[in-house]
A protein has these predicted regions:
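Active-site-proximal or metal-binding-adjacent scaffold patches in catalytic folds
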Residues: 1-56, 65-95
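Walker B catalytic acidic pair
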Residues: 61
């Protein structure tokens, strides 16, 4: 499921560098991106959540491959690829 969602979403991005995907259980994060190492890690627990949450985390982390910080440009890119990200982000704080 992770790979199919990732493949569907990454085509929305231009100039996305090649990167490695890692899935593992994390206790405090839904995802993490190491831009320098070109590695995206997703929390394996996302498999139990609605796909909108998985999609948001993927978009968020892929956006970090382009913008390392949470700048205005970063959030614009997230919104471009996940229109309702603000609501999804709010809902995820309840988990």
């Amino acid at each position: 499921m992770f790979n199919s969602r990732l493949e569907r979403l990454k085509i929305q991005f231009e100039n996305l560098p090649n990167f490695r995907l890692r899935i593992r259980k994390m206790s405090t994060r839904w995802g993490v991106c190491n831009k320098k190492l070109k590695k995206v890690t997703l929390n394996s627990e996302l498999i139990y959540k609605d796909t909108k949450y998985l999609d948001y985390v993927i978009v968020h982390e892929l956006s970090h491959l382009i913008h390392a910080n949470h700048s205005k440009s970063f959030w614009s890119l997230v919104e471009e690829n996940c229109r309702d990200y603000k609501q999804i982000k709010k809902e995820m704080k309840e988990f």
